[in-house]
Amino acid sequence: MFLTSSPSISLYLVEADSGKGKSTFCSYVVGYRHDYDGNVLFDADNTHNYTVSQWVSMRRTHISHLFQELRLFPEITAMENVQIQNKLTGFKSEEEILQWFDMLGIADKVNAKIGRMSFGQQQRVAMIRALVQPFDFILADEPISHLDDNNARIMGDIMMTEAKKQGAGVIVTSIGKHMDLNYERVVRL
C-alpha cells in the first residue's frame, strides 16, 4: 500500500465481512502491527523500517485513527478524552471542539464520564478525538456501527469537512453499513 502526504485519491472504502482483516489492515497502516508481507509506503518511505519515535511522529502529524474499539478512558469525561489528544498537538480550540459536540448531539455529555455513555455516544466522542490533530490520512474503522442514519450523516460531514481543510485522504472500513460518501475507490477484502 502506498500513502502520500498529498493524496490524489482521497476517499477509500474498505469493505469485508466480519473477521476478514479490516482492523488488521488499519493496524498495519498505523504501525501497530508489522507481521505482514509486502510494503506499506508513506511518501515512498517503507514504514516497516520506522523506529518507535518515527511512528510517534507519524501518528501525531500524518495519520489519525478512529479505532473500531474506540480506546476511550471510561473513568474520565468525554472532553477529557478529547483533550488528551488535543494537548499533544494543540491543533484545535476548545470552541471548535464544543461545536463538534453540539453538531453531533452530545453537547450535554461534554462533562459526562465515558463509562456512563452509550456506545453510539462514545463513537461520536472518539471521532471528535480523531479530528483534533493534523493528518494527511484519517482511518475510520467501522465508524458508524452504532449510529442512526442522521448521526452517521453528520459525522461523515464533519469528517469530510475537516479532511478537506487539511487536504487529507480518508479511509473508511465497513462490514456493510458505511457512511454515505462519494468513495473514489472501493476495496473488498
Residue ranges and their predicted role:
Residues 113-123:
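Conserved ABC ATPase signature
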Residues 38-48:
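Conserved ABC transporter NBD signature motif
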Residues 94-109:
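Conserved ABC ATPase "signature" region
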Residues 47-64:
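ABC ATPase NBD coupling module
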Residues 127:
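Hydrophobic anchor residue at the start of the ABC signature
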